Curated annotation (Swiss-Prot):
InterPro entries the UniProt entry points to: AAA+_ATPase, Chromosome_initiator_DnaA, Chromosome_initiator_DnaA-like, DnaA_C, DnaA_dom, DnaA_N_dom, DnaA_N_sf, P-loop_NTPase
Region (Domain I, interacts with DnaA modulators): 1-66
Domain of life: Bacteria
Organism: Pseudothermotoga lettingae (strain ATCC BAA-301 / DSM 14385 / NBRC 107922 / TMO)
Oligomeric and partner information: Oligomerizes as a right-handed, spiral filament on DNA at oriC.
Name of the protein: Chromosomal replication initiator protein DnaA
Region (Domain IV, binds dsDNA): 318-444
Binding site for ATP: 144, 146-148
One Pfam family recorded for the sequence: Bac_DnaA
The keyword Protein biosynthesis is annotated on this UniProt entry: no
Gene expressing this chain: dnaA
GO cellular component assignments: cytoplasm; plasma membrane
Gene3D superfamilies, A to Z: 1.10.1750.10, 1.10.8.60, 3.30.300.180, P-loop containing nucleotide triphosphate hydrolases
Length: 444
């Protein structure tokens, strides 16, 4: 019956979740009306009880045909110490110790590499493949640019490829809370032993949280020294460069700078578009390419905001049963409401085209192929479609052109802007700024 329980649970979970959280999960005992499970440590036990308790209960009821009680036990510290000290026993593999849950999506495979993060990505991958080679690694950059993704990716890689290596991933807030808790319970030595003697890799996120907290900085300093002197890998993430960590002990800042310091920059529009594509793919969502471009143009400053925008559109599609078009995306994401103003946005666009390019509305709507007229018309179509959210049919009607002509024109301008034609890009931006009140194309 043990194997049936395991297989039934496994079939209800995706592979990443199973490997991340159920790697040490096993059936210890089956009674007449209860089942006892065992996992590797307390944190995993608490996480499984909280997140998957109802699923476990439902699975047991299905298999036994009646309600079953269950409890999850974890290997005690004493048991682990006994196993470690018993030389006659076969070697017991030490699974990575994950204090804060790893997001199963945040792997190297799912990280989109661009010019802004190439060095950071390559360094983190090298650290994962060869722990201790670049030590310490200090990764910094603005909020929502992928630091945590890379940090957790290291954890996932080690969990998969180095099962004997003891890895701790946690936030600096968690590190502080653990210390405070150990002080309250008079177990500071246990805390120190855990972080200095029982791990091989420390992955510490959001170290800027410790700014101004002298006591915990001192503890981190000594922990850092112990790990470093033993050749154990340390990776630290922050939203700022080590030198910008105000109210941080100088000796600790100097430790951060001993190894490799690398920064993640803001992604360019092309990388943002690829990120939006990857996120949509991971969510199994179908969104038009122009919608993904809209999101990448307007949320490139913070990838968490970008994902939030994407999820909002996906949820709308799921709840309403309707496919989101470009104009609906503008509305749902509240991007520059001014061009959804009821006071004839078409008229505002046409007037702006005439004013900026020095042509008349009659020329724009005519069959004239004069270079200056054709260019003004084409840029007007592009802005109407990509910046104002008009449908292709609406753009075709407005400029008195066929649907295929409009589609071809927009594709042609897209190719020109992607190839780096700054003249065209600046003209598009000027018109877009005039009709929307903001510059949406940040790459200009």
């Amino acid at each position: 019956m043990k194997s049936e329980i395991i297989e039934s649970l496994k079939s209800k979970l995706n592979r990443r979740v199973w490997e991340s959280w159920f790697g040490t999960f096993d059936v210890k005992e089956i009674g007449p009306d209860y089942v006892v499970f065992q996992v590797g440590n307390l944190f995993i036990r608490e996480w499984l009880e909280k997140k998957y308790g109802s699923l476990i209960s439902k699975t047991l009821r299905e298999l036994f045909g009646k309600p079953m009680d269950f409890r999850i036990e974890h290997a005690s510290a004493k048991t682990e110490e006994k196993l470690d000290s018993n030389e006659d026993e076969p070697l017991v593999k030490k699974r990575p110790l994950i204090l804060t849950p790893l997001n199963p999506i945040l792997t190297f495979e799912n990280f989109v590499v661009g010019p802004n993060n190439m060095f950071a990505y390559s360094t983190c991958l090298e650290v994962a493949k060869n722990p201790g080679k670049y030590n310490p690694l200090f990764l910094h950059g603005g909020v929502g640019l992928g630091k945590t993704h890379l940090l957790q990716a290291i954890g996932h890689y080690l969990f998969k490829h180095e099962p004997d290596m003891r890895v701790i991933y946690l936030t600096s807030e968690r590190f502080l809370n653990e210390l405070v808790d150990s002080i309250k319970k008079n177990r500071v030595q246990e805390f120190r032993d855990k972080f200095r003697n029982k791990i091989d890799v420390l992955l510490l996120d959001d170290v800027q949280f410790l700014i101004g907290k002298t006591g915990i900085q001192t503890e981190l300093f000594h922990t850092f020294n112990e790990l470093y002197n033993e050749g154990k890998q340390i990776v630290v993430c922050s939203d700022r460069d080590p030198q910008q960590l105000e109210k941080f002990q100088d000796r600790l800042v100097s430790r951060f700078q001993m190894g490799v310091v690398t920064k993640i920059e803001k992604p360019d529009e092309e990388t943002c578009f690829k990120i939006a594509q990857k996120m949509a793919q991971l969510e199994n969502a179908e969104l038009q390419e122009d919608i993904l471009k809209l999101i990448s143009k307007n949320f490139s400053d913070n990838l968490r905001r970008l994902r939030g925008a994407l999820v909002k559109l996906i949820m709308y599609q799921q709840i309403s049963g309707e496919k989101v078009d470009l104009q609906k995306a503008f509305e749902l994401l509240a991007i520059q409401n001014s061009y959804h103003n009821k006071s004839l946005p078409e008229e505002k666009l046409m007037n702006s085209i005439c004013e900026i390019f020095g042509v008349s509305q009659e020329e724009i709507l005519s069959k004239s192929r004069k270079k200056e007229v054709a260019l003004a018309r084409q840029i007007g179509m592009y802005v109407a479609r990509n910046y104002m959210g008009f449908s292709l049919r609406k753009v075709a009607d407005m400029f008195k052109r066929s649907h295929p002509t409009v589609s071809h024109t927009i594709q042609k301008l897209e190719e020109l802007t992607n190839s780096g034609n700054m003249v065209i890009k600046s003209q598009i931006d000027r018109l877009a700024r005039c009709v929307t009140g903001q510059i949406l194309d940040q790459s200009v």
